A protein has these predicted regions:
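Alpha-helical transmembrane segments and their immediate juxtamembrane cytosolic regions
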Residues: 1-196
Length: 196
């Protein structure tokens, strides 16, 4: 009620006599863009709340003794640089291959299931890595490998980006180039999160 309303007011400044005239409309709770109620760039706060609520059963399980075998298996699979880079990336890409054809736009509202699941994967894997001391240490021990991988994936990402800007030309259909760009972007996102 403090950060976002000035942004909405500025977008509709010609419709109101002043800020306080506008601010009253925020409490009508009419969703943006028809109304003045929105989370705008604070969408991630609602997403984090929903992820936390949806994953409560997983949080409880991962902290219980029943998860010992699961954690050992996950630790074994994800503790190598290749495992920690590729397994989560492939899962993230798989979710997007299924969802993005139906939810292609990044709107950050509650009907944006494609990007909601995309960011939830990051949240889930973050919890998974943090919950296992060996995995957490493996990230630190393999930081150089992770950095090299993150830098390496920038090459195809920017080549494809430059194609869209007309600097580089590829002979493939635009749909193929957009798909490759999205895939390299997902790899780059996960690799960068692990590196940082």
């Amino acid at each position: 009620f403090v950060v976002v309303p000035p942004q909405i007011y500025y977008e509709h400044i010609a419709e109101y006599t002043g800020y306080f005239d506008f601010y009253k409309t925020v409490f009508n709770f009419v969703p943006y863009p028809e109304g003045s109620f929105s989370w705008h760039h604070l969408w991630f706060i609602l997403y984090l709340l929903l992820y936390s609520l949806l994953l409560i059963p997983f949080f409880n399980y991962i902290r219980s003794e029943r998860s010992e075998k699961f954690r050992a298996t996950v630790s074994r699979w994800l503790s190598s640089p290749a495992g920690m880079l590729l397994i989560p990336s492939v899962i993230i890409i798989f979710t997007q291959a299924i969802l993005r054809p139906y939810f292609p736009d990044e709107t950050h509202d509650l009907t944006d299931l494609g990007f909601f699941v995309f960011y939830m994967c990051f949240f889930f894997f973050g919890v998974l890595f943090y919950s296992d001391r060996n995995l957490w240490l493996a990230i630190g021990q393999n930081r150089k490998h992770l950095l090299v991988a993150a830098l390496f994936v920038l090459i195809p990402f920017y080549l494809l980006y430059f194609h869209f800007r007309g600097i580089v030309t590829f002979p493939w259909p635009e749909d193929t180039i957009e798909t490759l760009f999205d895939i390299t972007g997902m790899f780059m996102s996960w690799f960068t999160v692990l590196t940082v």
